[in-house]
């Protein structure tokens, strides 16, 4: 019987990373001198909440939750991660901001060892290092990145890494739409209160952009939640977030005419090598386990 190399969790992550990149590009496209980061956070959260609400009502999905504490923690950490990332998006090239944020798989691997008691094989550490090297090559040491912005980006990466672990702990006890709905609802409430002093009414074009941000954010969030509720190891799935950096390099070049070097494309190759090796290692482990249990 032919074994499946690409799991459902991986498929969900591929969809999620692409949609997140489109959402980020739309945020960067907004007039940053007029619309504040906190207002961007509000519209992204609120519109996604509406999408979730409509879908849940249409499909008769219950609003009841089992892991109240974990979902609350997930929502608060997710809000911090989202705001800090939206803050750095307009302040540096798209590829650079996404690169910094998606150091989160490194933190996920560390949190997985500490919190989920998952064990990393020596080869997995090597593959993480290859991916990390690829991310660094994508933009190198960019002098356009301020130290303060770098720190805020790292906050987003660390909180994002912890976020995946919490989703793994929630598991499939709660429906993915329920998890996303309460995250977006809480984020809307927090950012809605905070944005009152900075409110600027968006025009028609900006409103349409916000609608796109909410839609792509909704799809990305759902598929990321579904991915981490699968049975794959958290550190395995998290490495696919590196693809987002590659997507961002391409979109940044085509849409925002951002300049990149040969090292950037070499970095993309490193990332794909890491992902392919990770998939092969995981597939071999599954085949071995199946044979041993036959």
Language-model features, listed with the residues they occupy:
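Transmembrane alpha-helices of multi-pass small-molecule transport proteins
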Residues: 33-80, 159-162, 182-197
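Transmembrane alpha-helical segments that form core, pore/gating elements
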Residues: 21, 28-29, 37, 52, ...
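Hydrophobic/small/kink-forming positions within alpha-helical transmembrane segments
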Residues: 17, 21-22, 53, 75, ...
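Loop-to-transmembrane-helix transition segments
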Residues: 8-16, 56, 60-84, 148-158, ...
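Hydrophobic transmembrane alpha-helices of multi-pass small-molecule transport proteins
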Residues: 123-139, 263-282
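Membrane-interface helix-cap regions at the ends of transmembrane helices
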Residues: 2-3, 48-67, 133-145, 187-206, ...
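Helix-helix packing/entry segments at the starts of transmembrane helices
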Residues: 98-103, 174-183, 222-253
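C-terminal transmembrane-helix exit sites in multi-pass transporters
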Residues: 90, 104-126, 246-265
């Amino acid at each position: 019987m032919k074994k499946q190399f690409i799991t459902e969790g991986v498929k969900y992550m591929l969809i999620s990373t692409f949609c997140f990149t489109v959402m980020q590009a739309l945020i960067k496209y907004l007039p940053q001198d007029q619309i504040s980061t906190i207002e961007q956070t509000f519209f992204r959260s609120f519109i996604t909440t509406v999408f979730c609400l409509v879908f849940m009502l249409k499909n008769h999905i219950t609003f009841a939750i089992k892991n109240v504490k974990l979902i609350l923690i997930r929502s608060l950490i997710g809000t911090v991660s989202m705001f800090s990332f939206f803050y750095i998006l307009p302040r540096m090239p798209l590829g650079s901001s996404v690169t910094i944020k998606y150091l989160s798989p490194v933190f996920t691997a560390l949190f997985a060892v500490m919190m989920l008691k998952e064990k990393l094989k020596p080869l997995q550490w090597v593959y993480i290092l290859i991916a990390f090297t690829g991310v660094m090559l994508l933009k190198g040491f960019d002098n356009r990145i301020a130290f303060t912005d770098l720190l805020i980006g790292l906050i987003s990466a660390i909180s994002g890494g912890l976020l995946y672990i919490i989703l793994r702990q929630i598991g499939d006890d709660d429906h993915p739409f329920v998890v996303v709905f309460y995250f977006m609802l809480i984020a809307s409430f927090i950012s809605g209160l905070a944005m009152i002093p900075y409110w600027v009414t968006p025009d028609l074009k900006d409103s349409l952009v916000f609608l796109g941000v909410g839609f792509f954010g909704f799809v990305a969030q759902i598929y990321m939640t579904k991915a981490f509720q699968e049975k794959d190891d958290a550190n395995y799935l998290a490495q696919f977030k590196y693809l987002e950096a590659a997507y961002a390099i391409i979109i940044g070049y085509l849409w925002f005419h951002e300049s990149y070097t040969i090292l950037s494309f070499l970095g993309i190759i490193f990332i794909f090598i890491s992902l392919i090796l990770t998939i092969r290692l995981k597939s071999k482990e599954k085949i071995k386990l199946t044979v041993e249990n036959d």
